[in-house]
From Swiss-Prot:
GO terms for molecular function: large ribosomal subunit rRNA binding; structural constituent of ribosome. Part of the 50S ribosomal subunit. Forms a cluster with proteins L3 and L19. In the 70S ribosome, L14 and L19 interact and together make contacts with the 16S rRNA in bridges B5 and B8. NCBIfam families: rplN_bact. One of its GO terms (biological process) is translation. Keywords: Ribonucleoprotein, Ribosomal protein, RNA-binding, rRNA-binding. This is Large ribosomal subunit protein uL14. The keyword Ribonucleoprotein applies. It comes from the Bacteria.
Length: 122
């Protein structure tokens, strides 16, 4: 569960390294987000000479959470960290690579480009 003020690792090569959630998108009273949800974030740490700088406001999609996700078949999956992929204004990934595994729930939410770039889909 990702709420406001949560920190997310960045799982792509967009130039950001750490994000802080400002708002979970999808409704005015939305309390938390999970895998596949879009969040508005502030860049808290960035690589030198990258496209994104500290303080930039970006949209990102959550790709991994430490809180387990229940699937329709009754199984659960969880990851070792909370991570997101930075998006551009067309909801496409800003980077050209995705690091680490992603959940297959992204495919159902329509983020096919991220699924195809990921090395593993669980």
């Amino acid at each position: 569960m990702i709420i406001n003020e949560s920190y997310l690792n960045v799982a792509d090569n967009s130039g950001a390294k750490l994000l802080r959630v400002i708002r979970v998108m999808g409704g005015s009273r939305r309390k938390w987000g999970t895998v596949g949800d879009v969040v508005v974030c502030s860049v808290r740490d960035a690589v030198p000479n990258g496209d994104l700088k500290k303080g930039d406001v970006v949209k990102a999609v959550i790709v991994r959470t430490k809180k387990e996700i229940r699937r329709p078949d009754g199984t659960y999956i969880r990851f070792d960290d909370n991570a997101a992929v930075v998006l551009d204004k067309y909801n496409e990934p800003k980077g050209t690579r995705v690091f680490g595994p992603v959940a297959k729930e992204l495919r159902e939410k329509g983020f096919m480009k991220i699924v195809s770039l990921a090395p593993e889909v669980f």
